[in-house]
């Protein structure tokens, strides 16, 4: 195998001798770097001129063998073919290089990661198409090799990497916004999201783009169960083009306002009388700073002393100034309206900082974008001054959770070396702290009032005072008993591999980060996202991290069926608690029993004629409950009545889009695993999703097409029974049996109640 590998590498390197001998690298790569303005240069892995110049082939083969023995990397021979456009397939330039890729990387990301390793931009990688060739066979697309979304590079290329050539067709399209919506794919959407997340966080991006926050997180982290549908990709492409165009217009408006202010200062300077012979005076530094060419600013002898070589009428200058002011006012009003509609003011457009006109424009821009290293101390001082909690500050400053803010303050990462997502959060906090103190206090007060109103709307009693109907008691009891076992912390195996186990567990169970963080560590989705991003080395000295990872390790040590049951119970609990009205959550059990007794009395009055003495009817109320435990206890009947009000049957427009994408990708007959995945992703009960698919199958069979919902919410409770194409499943039969049994039970109770009434009357 090693001999064949060296022979193949020698053959391929001999074919690349022309490119290797060129110290500047392939011309296609140089043109691409100059066109996209990539700062990567040729210092990256894919730089032929910098990396392979003067390096013997035997040494490079030895390096590849060393990496292979470690078992983490695989060499892949790539041939990049550069086309002028996507229609005319005239190959202009091509070059070939080896790329080292991770074995555990997904196979469908091979093209993208190979181009990024070679130094190409995200937009170029998103628009590329790849073919794989084994030996001298005809090259085929990667999708023809396997359609498994979880297939890795090691699964597909472990045994044939030495005879495999990856041919990448790169079309010249300068920007993603210039790409037609029909050509958008799952890869282009993921790269566009990565580019957008450099300037904003996921929550603020989800408020603007047609994708939800959970879907954005899944696509970026490559945990989405399937590729985004073509319709969703086209919708995102249209939105991305409009978003970029609007952003460019705002940048142009800002630059126009800067130029108008500079022009106003220049006109005021030019209207001042200049003593002496101005034709002999050199241009002043102020004039040179406003002009691009010094010769233009030199006044001519035959002109008025205060004018430039190309005079501008004051009328035109005034018109430009008025137009700039109107545009600035319109921009400010639009931004104010957007801030009021978002409930979170300072995420997308930070408040403008007053710029001093005596500073150069480059310095002004840099001071606005830089984050001070004192930001962490500023936040602590602000928390002490205002007397607010970390949760309130995290919500109003950068719209995240208290757990994420606590982790940021604990680590105190240097802003100069911080990641893009952390920089976005730090910049948002810094922009918020630059507001006046009175404005910040007003925002804190508004947030407190909003929280109090939300709490009062839920009822006077806390949620924990409700009857113990929350299903995930198995999880809490199990973890609570394990928490008491203190000696387990010393023997527990906690190392850096726990982060990979967390990702594998979420992928296996098809659960979201929010659900896993809640059941495993009682944390938020933002906390888990930051934990997986930093992947800090576990150490008992870091007590907070060690305790959180210990909780996760205890949860992962549970048997797999028990973990799946906890996921299911927690998902159902979220549905149930979200669907119960506030007046039902906090009503005491005694009052509910009295209401049930009154309802049963009314039913008895409707079924049987009232007795001649109505004043004795209330005495029958207390006699009914003693007979109920013989069939069903009051707590069980109370639970049944609550379960009837809990289920959610409405499907939002966003969930409809995901379901329609699933129909286009998979079909109208999802299996149990797919239904469970959709239920967890859309936060909907399973029977709601089942009814939706049954209704769609009915319309396809009887009308020849799927039902058009016209972008409106759908309530599956409004579906008629004849509009559901379904088989008699066991769950449906059990439900019908329970319904018939409950009807018979009510009839028996009513008969017994009437018998008691007649007996009392006779007595």
Curated annotation (Swiss-Prot):
DNA binds at residues 390, 400-410, 425. CDD domains: homeodomain (cd00086), SATB1_N (cd11585). Changing residue 646 to A: Reduced interaction with matrix attachment region (MAR) DNA. It is found in: Nucleus matrix; Nucleus, PML body. Residues 591-607 have a biased composition (Low complexity). Changing residue 29 to A: Loss of nuclear localization, cytoplasmic. Residues 266-296 have a biased composition (Polar residues). Residues 1-54, 266-307, 591-649 are annotated as: Disordered. A motif (Nuclear localization signal) lies at residues 20-40. There is a cross-link at residue 744 (Glycyl lysine isopeptide (Lys-Gly) (interchain with G-Cter in SUMO)). It is linked to Den Hoed-de Boer-Voisin syndrome: A disorder characterized by global developmental delay, moderately to severely impaired intellectual development, poor or absent speech, delayed motor skills, and early-onset epilepsy in many patients. Most affected individuals have feeding difficulties, poor overall growth, dysmorphic facial features, and significant dental anomalies resembling amelogenesis imperfecta. More variable features include visual defects, behavioral abnormalities, and non-specific involvement of other organ systems. Developmental delay with dysmorphic facies and dental anomalies: A disorder characterized by mild global developmental delay, impaired intellectual development, walking by 2 to 3 years, and slow language acquisition. The severity of the disorder ranges from moderate cognitive deficits to mild learning difficulties or behavioral abnormalities. Most patients have dysmorphic facial features, abnormal dentition and non-specific visual defects. DEFDA transmission pattern is consistent with autosomal dominant inheritance with incomplete penetrance and variable expressivity. This is DNA-binding protein SATB1. It comes from Homo sapiens. The lineage of its organism: Eukaryota, Metazoa, Chordata, Craniata, Vertebrata.
